[in-house]
Amino acid sequence: PAVANEQHYEVPAEFFRIALGPHRKYSCAWWPEGVTNLGDAETMALSATCERAQLADGQHILELGCGWGSLTLWMAARYPNSRITAVSNSHSQRTWIETEAVRRRHSNVRVVTADMNHFDTDDRYDRVVSVEMFEHMRNWHALFGRIRQWLVPDGRFFMHVFCHRSVPYSFIDRGHDDWMSRHFFSGGMMPSDDLPIRFQ
């Protein structure tokens, strides 16, 4: 986590204002036919996540790996009676989200700075949502077990990861031309499509 933080999670927020779209979505956007700009593609992806996670106003929601708060702030605005706890391993991301939540007058957001390898809580949630965070994790079985404990009996877990159709692999720096492993995703993993099923 320390190398990934240095590479991009603790980069100043101003950089991401320039590099990302208006929601500062630090994960996949969705470009269906007719979508022609990044802001709309971010909106499409955020809407799809909420729909697929079956979010509803009044739920207690835990977001694992909240990035720059695109989903956190989106949920806070659309589900004002929900309580949203967002977890990030980045102090600068936490500061940005908390500042934006105050500016937008969202009183239903709490941000926790923690390494997901060690995060735990006694709270119980209706929904646990994770978008492109599990690619940093290694012990999925243990984390799935903790998530199960965090859910109320009829709660649901929604996980979005990028994946390879058949082969999981680690991003290991193998030389000067290995840009992704060296400069952007050191220690990360490309899961295979079926990997989550193997840890149920």
PLM region spans:
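Substrate-binding/catalytic lobe of Class I Rossmann-like enzymes that use SAM or dcSAM, i.e.
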Residues: 163, 169-200
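A short acidic, Gly/Pro-enriched loop at the edge of an enzyme's catalytic core
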Residues: 117-128
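Conserved Class I S-adenosyl-L-methionine-dependent methyltransferase catalytic core
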Residues: 1-52, 56
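Conserved SAM-binding loop of SAM-dependent methyltransferases across substrates and taxa
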Residues: 68-80
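A short glycine-rich, Lys/Arg-flanked "PGG" loop and its adjoining helix->strand segment in the class I
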Residues: 141-156
